[in-house]
Regions:
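Auxiliary Fe-S-binding modules of radical SAM enzymes
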Residues: 86, 91-173
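Core AdoMet radical
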Residues: 1-42, 47-87, 98-113
Length: 173
């Protein structure tokens, strides 16, 4: 996985990728970035293919403002990836957002995700009618023990949350 909107990524390269995306309408493409300001700049000037879902990463409360940069983009699905979730996000305005994925951090230096952080997001998604997908705990389990991420699983309070968004039909005039 890479960030197609990274500062070192040339917009001409993105043009060539989007050409292929347009030629393969049978597939759905998720474009995720930590640089939604670049995403916004590009897609306010360029067509967003119908089979593209645009998203941004929100790993901590410090970067919540990224949501505002994708909220009004004309795409069939706008989504947020809280991966890795490393702090409580507090109150979220999910208006205009269709899907939120929450994931704990993996790897040797992984930081723990607290259950209440994930539950806070899940409850807000439910309240605001946004699809919620809890992918996995990562290296730290809900019990605060570090182990293999597969052992920690993907249950949140004993439930699997694997909701997907409904795509909005784009109106072509």
């Amino acid at each position: 996985m890479s960030d197609l909107l990274h500062e070192k990524m040339d917009y001409n390269f993105l043009d060539s990728i989007l050409k292929v995306i347009k030629e393969t309408p049978q597939h759905k493409y998720q474009i995720l970035t930590k640089r939604p300001q670049r995403m916004r700049k590009y897609f306010l000037k360029n067509e967003i293919p119908k089979n593209v879902w645009l998203g941004t990463t929100i790993e901590s409360n410090k970067v919540k403002s990224r949501i505002d940069l994708i909220r009004d983009l004309d795409t069939s699905v706008k989504w947020i990836s809280c991966e890795p979730l490393i702090s409580d996000l507090g109150e979220l305005d999910l208006s205009g957002i269709d899907w939120v994925i929450t994931v704990g951090e993996s790897g040797v230096n992984a930081r723990p995700m607290k259950e209440e952080w994930a539950l806070n997001i899940q409850k807000q998604c439910k309240k605001q009618n946004v699809a919620f997908f809890f992918k996995q705990w990562g290296a730290w389990g809900s019990d605060g023990i570090k182990r293999n991420k597969k052992e920690n699983g993907a249950l949140l309070k004993g439930k699997i949350y694997h909701a997907y968004p409904k795509e909005k039909k784009k109106i072509v005039i």
